[in-house]
């Protein structure tokens, strides 16, 4: 029986790279991993805490003239909706944190970075190390599976049909520089008692080709009927 491996880990070292860059003694390695998790969780919690409740942001779709009203009200299940990934680089006295984000409006506010650095300093409680945080805006947000998954989550929470939500998400990738995309949703779709899985695919998706650059994410969506699982594969290019 065939086993499904994570597409990102399968390509680590070829088309995918590590998100943490540091060296440590073997006995201190576990502490470094726990520290990385604390840093990432602290950043996600900061964004969730400082998000204005009920404020709306309009995102103009690249694929059509449709303007999507994107509700910024957050719940406990979607604290990192606009962060694609966080890179951590550790030196002797400095921890460099690079936040790759699709819509960095919140972190562009005056004093936001300084406040986040103070929160991280308290969380890690490291006297000899200081934090250096930088923000990198993703050039093509709808080329990122995390952002597409969050968009689908927003649609489903607003009682939009799951098939319509998947089709709209694929439409957003039309003008992005990609060669294939697949969206899969599993769970009690439409409130049915029996769980099932539905998927839509467009273009190529060579999962067994290691040199193929494929982005992937798995995203849980909490609804009144239970938790739905969204998986998105995006075939960017082939090296």
Curated annotation (Swiss-Prot):
Keywords: Chloroplast, Plastid, Ribonucleoprotein, Ribosomal protein, RNA-binding, rRNA-binding. Pfam families: Ribosomal_S3_C (PF00189). GO terms for biological process: translation. It is found in: Plastid, Chloroplast. InterPro entries: KH_dom-like_a/b (IPR015946), KH_sf_prok-type (IPR009019), Ribosomal_S3_C_sf (IPR036419), Ribosomal_uS3_bac-typ (IPR005704), Ribosomal_uS3_C (IPR001351), Ribosomal_uS3_CS (IPR018280). One of its GO terms (molecular function) is rRNA binding. Its main location: plastid. Residues 50-74 are annotated as: Disordered. Residues 43-139 form the KH type-2 domain. One of its GO terms (cellular component) is ribosome. It comes from the Eukaryota. Part of the 30S ribosomal subunit. Belongs to the universal ribosomal protein uS3 family. PANTHER family: 30S/40S RIBOSOMAL PROTEIN S3, SMALL RIBOSOMAL SUBUNIT PROTEIN US3C. This is Small ribosomal subunit protein uS3c. It comes from Triticum aestivum (Wheat). The lineage of its organism: Eukaryota, Viridiplantae, Streptophyta, Embryophyta, Tracheophyta. The gene is rps3.
């Amino acid at each position: 029986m065939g086993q499904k491996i994570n597409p990102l880990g399968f390509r680590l070292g070829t088309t995918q790279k590590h998100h943490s860059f540091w060296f440590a003694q073997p006995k201190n390695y576990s502490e470094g991993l726990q520290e990385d998790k604390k840093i990432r969780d602290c950043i996600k919690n900061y964004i969730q805490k400082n998000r204005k409740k009920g404020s709306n942001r309009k995102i103009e779709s690249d694929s059509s003239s449709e303007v999507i009203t994107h509700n910024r009200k957050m719940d406990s299940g979607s604290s990192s909706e606009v962060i694609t990934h966080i890179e951590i680089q550790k030196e002797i006295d400095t921890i460099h944190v690079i936040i790759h984000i699709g819509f960095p409006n919140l972190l562009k506010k005056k004093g936001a970075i300084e406040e986040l650095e103070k929160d991280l300093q308290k969380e890690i409680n490291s006297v000899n190390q200081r934090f250096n945080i930088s923000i990198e805006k993703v050039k093509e947000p709808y080329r990122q599976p995390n952002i597409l998954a969050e968009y689908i989550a927003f649609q489903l929470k607003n009682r939009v049909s799951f098939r319509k939500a998947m089709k709209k998400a694929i439409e957003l990738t039309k003008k992005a520089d990609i060669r294939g995309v697949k969206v899969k949703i599993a769970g009690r779709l439409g409130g049915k008692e029996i769980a099932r899985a539905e998927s839509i695919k467009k273009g190529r998706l060579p999962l067994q080709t290691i040199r193929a650059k494929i982005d992937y994410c798995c995203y849980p969506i909490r609804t009144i009927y239970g938790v739905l699982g969204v998986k998105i594969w995006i075939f960017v290019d082939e090296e």
